[in-house]
Amino acid sequence: MMLHNAKASDNNELDQAKPLIPQLSDKQKEALNDACGRIAPTWPLDELIAVNPWWEMRDQHISKVSAKLSALSQAQCVMPKSYFQEVWMETLQPQHVQQAIDEMEKDYTVDNLERYLLEEDEHTHWHNVSDFVDSGRDRKYKMAWRDEITHQISQFCADFFRLKDSQGTFSKTYQGLYHEWLATTRQDKGIEILMGEDGLTEHFMDLPESSESLLAEALVGLRVPDSQIADYAHALLLDANGWASWVAYLRWQDRLSNAENDLMMDFLAIRVAWEWVLWQHQKDSDRSVFNELKVMWHHQMSILPDLIATHEAAQAKSWIWQRAAEIAYQSELQQQLKHASRTDQKVETESPPVLLQAAFCIDVRSEVIRRALEAQDSRVETLGFAGFFGLPIEYQPAGTDVSRPQLPGLLKSGIKVTPVMTKVSKGATKQALNRKARWIEWGNAPPATFSMVEATGLMYAFKLLRNSLFPESHTNPINAIPATDAFELTQNDSPLTLDQKVELAAGILHAMGLDHDLAETVMLVGHGSTSCNNPHAAGLDCGACGGQTGEINVRVLAFLLNDESVRQGLLEKDIKIPAQTRFVAAMHNTTTDEFTCFGLNHVDETIQKWLARATEFARQERSTRLGLNHLEGQNLHQSIQRRAKDWSQVRPEWGLSNNAAFIVAPRARTRGVDFQGRAFLHDYDWQQDADNSLLTLIMTAPMVVTNWINLQYYASVCDNHVYGSGNKVLHNVVDGCIGVFEGNGGDLRIGLPMQSLHNGEKWMHEPLRLSVYIDAPQKTIAQVVAENDVVRHLIDNEWLYCFSWAPDGRIHRYFNNQWLESA
């Protein structure tokens, strides 16, 4: 019995000796999930679409988000005072500033706001542990911890996600992103040597094996209060915002499939681990320095809410200047809309029959070419619709297993499209893709980097010389759509039935307003761009098509709508397509303004002449922004062609720069109005939308997409270091498509390069929040807002402006559940 008791006693002692595994409390988990949820995604280069980098914080007012980001990471969401000084001298009027003051109910005067622009900014910001340690480090002889942490995490992620991507999934031994990083870092003795810090590796060896244990241990050790965890974690994620955004993209893709992953929490754990290692290392290295660090750290933690409040107060006047700049633009635009309303009321007694209806993407670049095409003849009618033309598809080249989405990033594809081809053509396509894949795989493999240069250097030197003297366009085989008018549409590996095709076609025609009064020729115009040696080329293509050209979408839709069996089925839905009506797929090249029509036998000579003249008109209008307004005709054409094929050209076109408005109305109300390529134009007739379903669709999809585009350009101008990708000339592509580094390291860069925003002398994009004008009853607009939280957050938190545009020209702003007449 005594022996038994002794053994029991021994076991109790052993149990007590076992270290407890740290665990997060429910409050801590909630706070960490909050921080992880604040990061917006960035898409890969081959599917590049514009993203609002503050999307995941849309439920907060933009000024509060701005203050928090400024306090936590020095990221800027509003332009600097120097910018507003220039705007004040050049374009703003006192009445614009006064109106902004009145709107925001601030006790300021125009004079003291002007003085504010001359004051120096002196505001402290949050410092992570690594920043405090760097402040006492001899930077002449030692590398900064901030730089090393960024470099180490970035290089690890580049390698890790390259391997994951090439395999299509994680390996069988994968135990989590944090675990993989920990194993890699423990084996890397070079960090200790590089940083000149003996004993550093031991602290990595002591880190917990799981991300949750690490987070729990570090939060306790660093004495982070539950109330400050979310902001502290957010600050750490902002330290590596590029890779955090990539992880957010992987999360986004999983959620489209109703799945979840823990990558963001693991990524956060990696950054927290570095904080904890440095804290422990300082504690062991120099107790007196550590004590100073501890005092500063805990003091900073205690005043974090006050720090954020200080930044909010400091930025208040800048937001008035921002609002004044937006009022200046809105005032001018609204005068155009009011004048257009007066003109629109002068109804013609007789209108010539429409010979051509051309449906374009709502992209701001389409506004210029649409206006040019309409100017050719009164029998031309254009309309605007989302560039994927309502097709929820992904494109799979014949004879392959690869596919790409052809729809907005907000949506998940449901239909797979494959060209109908002969066996010989399928085989040729497959061989071309396999050759391309092997070449890319060889070039991207780290061990092959130098051997590839040695083996192909002479060939590439010749290629470089050839491209310099005889520039030409190059197309990836997966983007080369074969010359066929037939496509196979499948869903869940089964061909679409006729009823499904009819249902799809009917929905699209109704949404586009093409379910009645059709012309003999209806052009479906997608768009794409042309540039060389441009990692961000997909960003110049159609964002609504997932960063691809719209070619496959318009060709598939034309195929469906020209199908006699589909037309017969549409009759049962009271949609009659006249026998003489032909749908023609076409492409608008936004770089050269040229049109390409597929099936020219359906486009008569008159229409071809209209298209050619419209190209000349649009090209001449755009020449000023390109710095080519000294050229005309053929000389201008040749110059633009050279730009498009020049491998050294960093500004082939200006993309969607200077976008500022989204107008939802019948084209008849805006025809002839020069929006200067700054407005997204979406056709909509509320009288054909009895159940408000079309307006709901527009405000929850295209309006959200335009917000993403608008705020990506806005953010890339406000803070290109954080939300832009820097100097295009210095870009190095990460794993073929993940993103770019600026130079050979640092964080993954997101957003737009400087050359897409600035011409070397001035900004080519004016950073203004999107102004949305909707021709619909106010009650209807308010109902859509009330029923959709995303829309309400965007409007009430001033991520965009929402206006009603009445038939008599009156304009009212909707804000906080009330309509306010706009001056």
Curated annotation (Swiss-Prot):
Regulation: Intracellular DIC accumulation is sensitive to CCCP (carbonyl cyanide-m-chlorophenylhydrazone) and DCCD (N,N-dicyclohexylcarbodiimide) and therefore likely driven by either proton potential, ATP, or both.
Signal peptide location: none
Membrane-protein topology: Peripheral membrane protein
Co-factor requirement: Zn(2+)
The entry's keywords: Cell inner membrane, Cell membrane, Membrane, Metal-binding, Transport, Zinc
One MF annotation (Gene Ontology) recorded for this entry: zinc ion binding
Compartments where located: Cell inner membrane
Induction annotation: Induced by growth in low levels of dissolved inorganic carbon (DIC) (at protein level).
HAMAP family, per database record: DabA (MF_01871)
Assembly, per entry: Forms a complex with DabB.
Family to which this protein belongs: Belongs to the inorganic carbon transporter (TC 9.A.2) DabA family.
Name of the protein in its database record: Probable inorganic carbon transporter subunit DabA
Organism: Hydrogenovibrio crunogenus (strain DSM 25203 / XCL-2) (Thiomicrospira crunogena)
Native organism taxonomy: Bacteria, Pseudomonadati, Pseudomonadota, Gammaproteobacteria, Thiotrichales
Gene of this entry: dabA
